[in-house]
A protein has these predicted regions:
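Active-site-facing alpha/beta catalytic cores
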Residues: 76-77, 82-327, 370, 378, ...
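Short coil-to-beta-strand
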Residues: 65-66, 351-353
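Short flexible/disordered coil segments
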Residues: 352-357, 386-387, 411-426
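Long, contiguous, compositionally biased segments that the model treats as domain-scale units
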Residues: 2-144
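Conserved phosphate/anionic-ligand binding catalytic regions in large, soluble enzymes, centered on
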Residues: 295-296, 355-359
Length: 451
């Protein structure tokens, strides 16, 4: 179990406060922020240290080439979307993707949601201007409001408490869905069969769906009905961006005396906050959770090795995951050196592709969007690099929703640029909709089989 930190451990994990911290809100009322932090420090953990250790063990299998990671969810969660309907749709999509990938890869698929904490977003500009009016940029529901008004855009520390309660509600629903029969493998496969029948690309996926069906029928005929068919292991993750929040939810594990960030099972450090001598890396170095680092096209092999020294000095498989976000046009050139140098160092890290963030562009309509073909091509490049080097393509990290939005162009249902306005609902970056997400899962399954 975890307990509140004592004064000595608080000092140990708060060493980040003396370092530069990028992308932090400028709260107008420092005393109000201190009061909120003190209250958060008294709240129960959202996850337990033992669960974080369990995910570390699963990620160790990924790093050794014995498992595959499916990590996905909203670009930025919103408080308004904390409903059974939205959470169920997102979870359903991830479960369907996981079932396809598990069968095709013939290895366990570790399912990790961008969920129950992804309420904050780093931004490229501190302000936004519309019709001559300049206001602070929207930084996620945990910081300020989406409405373009002066009042809404003022950072409000009370939103940190709302993030905690929204995350708790979401985790409660996820735990209920994943253990209460909703995640039964046979039900998930039935959903996939419906998708194959209705998808314009369904004919391409029909053989794989039929193979899964035959395997399930064979096990049923043998009288096999393991408990694992009825429940699923599911973990939460988010970007550790708002350090006041993450620090307030850092606790001591009573078993070991180690520090854990109990806001989620896994946290990652983003491309804009991964400076080696800054606060985010320092904070991550103090906690025992599995840690991800986003690596963009500017990342050097030397930097990657320094992240290993700072965050995984004991070289423990499962501790560190590199989430690569290069762009479809750069991954084949930039990734090989990183993988080669890291592998040569003897470190055993998990490699995951994020094919979303390097492929964003602005359509003529003004909508930020992504081409499904670019997303797919970056995944292909990721697999090609690992195949050529004899290393393991450990997983995919995708921004997605279970809803039928129109935010990314392409896919089996062929969304066009002119369609973007129809259901463009994201609070920040464009997400794959349910159909595009399942298209991607079937196509990644084909790639894995070709490895």
């Amino acid at each position: 179990m975890t307990v509140n930190a004592d004064s000595r451990s608080v000092a140990a994990q708060a060493t980040w406060r003396s370092l530069p911290a990028a992308q932090q809100p400028e709260y107008p009322d420092a005393e109000a922020l201190r009061d909120v932090i003190a209250e958060l420090e008294s709240y129960p953990p959202l996850v337990f240290a033992g669960e974080c250790d369990q995910l570390r063990a699963r990620m160790a299998a990924v790093a050794r080439g014995e498992a595959f990671v499916l990590q996905g969810g909203d670009c930025a969660e919103s408080f308004d979307a904390v409903s059974a309907e939205h959470i169920r749709a997102k979870l359903k999509t991830l479960l369907q993707m996981g079932a396809v990938l598990t069968y095709a890869a013939s290895v366990p698929v570790v399912k990790v949601g961008r969920i129950a904490g992804q309420y904050s977003k780093p931004r490229s500009k501190p302000t936004e201007t519309r019709d001559g009016v300049t206001l602070p940029t929207y930084r996620g529901d945990s910081v300020n409001g989406f409405d373009f008004t002066e009042a809404a855009r003022i950072p409000d520390p009370e939103r940190l408490k709302r993030m905690y309660h929204a995350s708790a509600s979401t985790l409660n629903l996820v735990r209920a869905f994943t253990t209460g029969g909703y995640a039964d493998l046979r039900q998930v496969h039935a959903w996939n069969q419906d998708f194959v029948k209705s998808s314009p690309s369904g004919q391409r996926y029909e053989q794989l769906a039929r193979e899964i069906d035959n395997a399930l029928n064979f096990m049923r005929a043998c009288g096999t009905d393991p408990a694992e068919f009825q429940t699923v292991e599911f973990f939460s993750s988010h970007e550790a961006l708002l350090l006041d929040y993450e620090s307030a939810l850092t606790r001591v594990d009573s078993r070991t005396g180690q520090l854990y960030d109990v806001s989620g099972h896994m946290v990652w450090i983003g491309e804009r906050t991964r400076q080696l001598d800054h606060a985010h890396i320092e904070f991550a170095s103090r906690i025992r959770n599995p840690i991800g680092i986003k690596l963009g096209p500017s990342t050097t092999a030397e930097e990657a090795l320094q992240y290993i020294e700072r965050l995984d000095p004991e070289r423990e498989p499962g501790r560190l995951t590199f989430i690569v976000r290069m762009g479809a046009d750069k991954i084949r050139d930039k990734l090989p050196e990183l993988v080669e140098k890291v592998t040569a160092s003897g470190a055993t890290v998990a490699w995951i592709t994020d094919p979303m963030h390097g492929n964003t562009y602005e359509a003529a309509s003004g909508h930020k969007t992504r081409r499904f073909d670019d997303v797919l091509d970056e995944v292909k490049g990721f697999f090609e690099v690992h195949k050529s080097l004899g290393t393991h393509p450990g997983g995919i990290h995708v921004e997605l929703t279970g809803d039928d939005v129109t935010e990314c162009v392409g896919g089996g249902d062929e969304i066009f640029v002119d369609d973007l306005h129809q259901r463009y609902e994201t609070a920040c970056d464009p997400r794959l909709n349910r159909s595009q997400s399942l298209d991607l899962a079937f196509l990644v399954a084909e790639m894995y089989r070709d490895q």
